[in-house]
């Protein structure tokens, strides 16, 4: 974490390795070049993902400070500092050996940006430091956005549920994704601090979780996998993709328990939009504009493959096998040209598995491949759930059956909470399809209630 501050605040940065010295900017340029090559052919292993995490954070702060210095140099008014919540979200991309340094390691950097924090005091516990920081973020911003960062493994002792673990990056909901929703409409945050452990917010319970998927897709090497001739075909293929296929089929089975959907949409239509957080309606999917017809076709092909043999309307397993073997499996000439003898042997071992056939189908057509990619992006580390009101949604992996779904004044996303004593433990933000634009938000404030996070 300290290196982020050193890079962002330093006027001239160098990197030393033995007797060699390299300017920081040249190192970054070289790493970016390698990253681009990795994206094309991956000759050096899984480099690109780690590059993004290690470089984007200091680059973010460098950019903020550069703009601030430029405006000051030309006598322009100082820019409004970014909110502490956004800065902490970016800082969470880095790790600190000493958990207290997740905050104290960027103290000078925050000061340079015009953001004030309590003076560093290493005699305080990690929980106390993190709680003070979260409280400061809420009061300075007069908002509750810091709560979006809550999902974590909660390794810090005595940490209130509404306080993020600032030394663990969950990446569950980037801020630029949150802004496209408005589950509490244009309401403003209303909150009170009962004591150092409790935060009370104004909101409304709109249901509970009655069922959930069990398999959670983790952050694995599969995100870098491409169905191309230069892949390594071995038992690792099954290890990588088994949880994906298992989760996909669980989601289809869970959606199949619904006979109708509260919005009047078809159940399959609701599933289609839930798994990608309604992105086609919001005209955004990565850096691409969705073509609605291609999107619908992509989901149709996706669902046909992943639900093969599950329902009366699904394609049969025999049909899936026939289509895949007839179109997508490499023929002998291709095998001899692109695969080694060992690869050909390993391919024979996996090509008859359901996992291989489904993945072959998903990667064979562009609309299906694109839909599958966005599903992986949105559903990684998430569960699909069914609510007591018949809605489908996605939640952090810690969510359980019985957890409540609440809308909170001032927050764009619904939150998952769990009863604990006289209060509620905050689990994290959720996407609940059909209530993301304020459909369930009360018309009058008197219908709201105080929710106590402990």
What are the language-model segments listed below?
Residues 1-454:
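Acidic/Ser/Thr/Pro-rich low-complexity tail/linker regions in eukaryotic proteins
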């Amino acid at each position: 974490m300290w290196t982020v501050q050193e890079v962002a605040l330093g006027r001239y940065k160098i990197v030393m390795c033995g007797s060699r010295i390299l300017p920081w900017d040249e190192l970054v340029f070289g790493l970016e070049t390698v990253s681009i090559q990795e994206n094309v052919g991956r000759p050096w292993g899984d480099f690109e993902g780690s590059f993004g995490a290690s470089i984007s954070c200091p680059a973010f702060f460098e950019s903020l400070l550069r703009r601030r210095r430029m405006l000051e140099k030309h006598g322009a008014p100082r820019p409004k500092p970014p909110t502490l919540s956004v800065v902490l979200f970016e800082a969470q991309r880095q790790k600190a050996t000493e958990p207290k340094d997740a905050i104290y390691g960027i103290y000078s950097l925050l000061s340079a940006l015009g953001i004030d924090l309590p003076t560093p005091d290493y005699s305080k516990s990690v929980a106390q430091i993190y709680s003070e920081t979260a409280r400061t973020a809420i009061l300075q911003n007069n908002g509750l956005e810091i709560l979006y960062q809550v999902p974590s493994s909660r390794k810090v002792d005595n940490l209130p549920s509404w306080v993020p673990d600032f030394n663990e990056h969950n990446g569950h909901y980037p801020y630029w994704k949150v802004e496209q929703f408005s589950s509490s409409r244009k309401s403003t945050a209303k909150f009170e601090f009962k004591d150092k452990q409790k935060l009370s917010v104004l909101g409304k319970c709109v249901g509970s979780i009655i069922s959930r998927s069990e398999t959670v897709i983790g952050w694995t090497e599969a995100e870098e996998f491409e169905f191309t001739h230069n892949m390594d075909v071995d038992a690792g293929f099954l290890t990588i993709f088994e949880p994906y296929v298992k989760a996909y089929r669980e989601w289809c089975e869970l959606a199949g328990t619904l006979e109708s959907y509260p919005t009047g949409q078809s159940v399959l239509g609701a599933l289609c939009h839930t798994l990608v957080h309604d992105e086609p309606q919001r005209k955004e999917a990565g850096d691409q504009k969705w073509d609605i017809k291609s999107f619908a076709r992509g989901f149709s092909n996706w669902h046909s493959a992943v639900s093969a043999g599950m329902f009366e309307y699904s394609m049969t397993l025999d049909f899936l096998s026939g289509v895949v073997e007839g179109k997508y499996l490499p023929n002998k000439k291709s095998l001899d040209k692109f695969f080694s003898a060992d690869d050909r042997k390993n391919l024979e071992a996996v090509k008859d598995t359901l996992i291989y056939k489904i993945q072959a189908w998903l990667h064979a057509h562009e609309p299906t491949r694109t839909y599958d990619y966005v599903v992986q992006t949105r559903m990684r580390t998430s569960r699909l759930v069914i609510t007591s009101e018949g809605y489908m949604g996605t939640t952090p992996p810690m969510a359980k059956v019985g957890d409540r779904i609440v809308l909170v004044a001032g927050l764009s996303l619904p939150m998952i909470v769990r009863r604990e004593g006289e209060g509620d433990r905050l689990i994290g933000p959720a996407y609940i399809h059909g209530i993301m634009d304020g459909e369930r938000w009360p018309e009058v404030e008197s219908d709201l209630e105080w929710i106590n996070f402990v």
